[in-house]
């Protein structure tokens, strides 16, 4: 061993392992086999493990005793209240509304391990379950009691949310008939939908509280013009990655960029007539009266060009 290291090990001013703590752990000049002698044998390790196991067992037993004592005390105080003795969730009266809500216990309901705040949950359950058996809050509480999954504060937050939702629904939900009566009194034309009421203002049907002044018919709702095509069913479609995609199946942003309302509203008869003409032109090489009107200008230049080229190239006319 180098002289310096040996000096440091023998030194009483060791910076990390001070004084006697270092003695017997490292080989020194006086005791070269100290580290071998001090290492624990297998027997020592076994004894230490046994001691640790016994200590843990004692701790567990103590905990179990404490839990049982607390449960006994809690149930004694709880059973004094007669109205809560009905809290047997397997009783048909209280559990009918829970059928279909999830797996039911196969044996009779046994009170499970009581967590610190279960008494408060039970008091809340007493408040909610017996007033209205279909109450979502009662159902939530029963689920929580069975699962033992969430803390009381979480459950309480859920209850508050549910209560707020119920209150809002109560405030909002007039029946459709009541809404119709109220709006008819205003002298407007009213029609009843599945979930709401519509009022006719001008020539459009509006839901209550959505009317924002006179409606202006603008030429387009989209920032870009429609760049796709119409098929024979008069559906708009565009080519995306080599596939024909109907614009109504596109997500909103793509649809917004590609789609716009038609230039003019056509009647069903006009649409059918155009489809028929397209069909005749493709399969029979005749028709296309409509396109003559579209392309015709005052001087007839465009129409003449079309006529000339189509007659020359394809041997057919756009007009009869």
UniProtKB/Swiss-Prot annotation:
Entry keyword Mitochondrion: no
InterPro entries assigned to the protein according to its UniProt record, in alphabetical order: MMTV_SAg (IPR001213)
Topology relative to the membrane: Single-pass type II membrane protein
Keywords of the record: Glycoprotein, Membrane, Signal-anchor, Superantigen, Transmembrane, Transmembrane helix
Subcellular location: Membrane
Transmembrane segments: 45-65
Spans within the Extracellular topological domain: 66-320
Sugar-modified residues: 80-81, 90, 94, 132, 147
GO cellular component, one term: membrane
Pfam families per record: MMTV_SAg
Source organism superkingdom: Viruses
General function of this protein: Superantigen.
Protein family: Belongs to the mouse mammary tumor virus PR73 superantigen family.
Note: This protein is coded in the long terminal repeat (LTR).
Protein's recorded name: Protein PR73
């Amino acid at each position: 061993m180098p002289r310096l290291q040996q000096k440091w090990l023998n030194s009483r001013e060791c910076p990390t392992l001070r004084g006697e703590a270092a003695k017997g752990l490292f080989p020194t000049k006086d005791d070269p086999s100290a580290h071998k002698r001090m290492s624990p044998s297998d027997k020592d390790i076994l004894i230490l493990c046994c001691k640790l196991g016994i200590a843990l067992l004692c701790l567990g037993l103590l905990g179990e005793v404490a839990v049982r004592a607390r449960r006994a005390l809690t149930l004694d105080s709880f059973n004094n209240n007669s109205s809560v003795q009905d809290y047997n969730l397997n009783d048909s009266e209280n559990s009918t509304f829970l059928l279909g809500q999830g797996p039911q216990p196969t044996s009779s309901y046994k009170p499970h391990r009581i967590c610190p705040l279960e008494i408060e949950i039970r008091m809340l359950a007493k408040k909610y379950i017996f007033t209205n058996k279909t109450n979502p809050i009662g159902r939530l509480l029963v689920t929580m009691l069975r699962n033992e999954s969430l803390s009381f504060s979480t459950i309480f937050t859920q209850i508050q949310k549910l209560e707020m939702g119920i209150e809002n629904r109560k405030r909002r939900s007039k029946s459709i008939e009541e809404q119709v009566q109220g709006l008819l009194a205003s002298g407007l034309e009213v029609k009843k939908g599945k979930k709401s009421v519509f009022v006719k203002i001008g020539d459009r049907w509006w839901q209550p509280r959505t009317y924002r002044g006179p409606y202006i018919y603008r030429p387009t709702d989209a920032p870009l013009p429609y760049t796709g095509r119409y098929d024979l069913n008069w559906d708009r479609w565009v080519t995306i990655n080599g596939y024909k995609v109907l614009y109504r199946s596109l997500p909103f942003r793509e649809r917004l960029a590609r789609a716009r309302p038609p230039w003019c509203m056509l009647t069903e008869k006009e649409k059918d007539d155009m489809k028929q003409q397209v069909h005749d032109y493709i399969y029979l090489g005749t028709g296309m009266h409509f396109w003559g009107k579209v392309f015709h200008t005052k001087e007839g230049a465009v129409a003449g060009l079309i006529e000339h080229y189509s007659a020359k190239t394809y041997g057919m006319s756009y007009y009869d």
